[in-house]
Amino acid sequence: MNEEQAVLNFFAQKENLPLALSVANQVDGTRQKLNNDFWLALSERIVASTPDWRVSTTEDRNATESLVGLYLQPEAEQKLYLRPMLEQQYLGDTLRIYYGLMWSAEPTLEQKQLSVIYTLHNTFQEAGFKSNESFLAWQWTSYYPRSMDFILRFSTTADALLNEATSLIQNLLVSHRDALHAANTALRESSRSAAISVVSLDKLRVNLER
C-alpha cells in the first residue's frame, strides 16, 4: 500500500471524519485561492498583450470574493459591443472554461442583422463555435479549473498554462481583428442612430402638443 492510499484509508474511517472534514475545508480554500490567482495572473498577461482593449475580471454573482473569468472592452465607450471573454461555468458537477464573443447588452433584431455582424457570426459558426442569445460565438476549452491536473499544472508550470490560455484570446483578436473592429463600430453607430431617432421623435411629440 502506498502512502497516498494509506492517508485516504485513514480519513475514510468513521472516527476520523471530523479531521477529514477539516482538511476538506482547508483544501477547498486552497482551490479557491489558486482559482483566483489564475484569473488575476491571466488578466495581467492579457493586459500586457492587448493594448487596444481594457481588461476586467468577472466575479461570481453569489460570492464577490470569487473570480470566475475575464472580459475585454473596446477603448471607445459604448453600451452595446461584442466583448472577447473567458469564463468558467459549471458543467455537471465540475467547472469548465469556455471563451468567445459575448454581447455586452441585448441587441435589437436589426442590430443582429447588420451585415458585419451576420458575416462575423457565420465565420465563427464555420469554425465550430456555437451561439445563443447572449453569445455571438462561444466554445468550450479543455480546461477544468478545479481539477487536480489543472491545479497541479498551475502550481508547477504556471507560465506555460497562462501562455496557452492567453493565446486563445490573442488568436481570436488577431484572426478577427478587422471584422471585430468593424462590428463594434457598426454597433456603436447603430446605437447612436437609434438614440437620435428617439430624441427626434420626442421633439416631434412636443411640437404636436403645442
Question: What is each of the regions a protein language model found here?
Answer:
Residues F10-F150:
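Polyanion-binding interface signature
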Residues P107-R210:
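Ampiphathic alpha-helical segments that act as solvent-exposed interaction surfaces
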Residues M1-R45, V174-L180, N184-A194, V198-E209:
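N-terminal domain-onset segments
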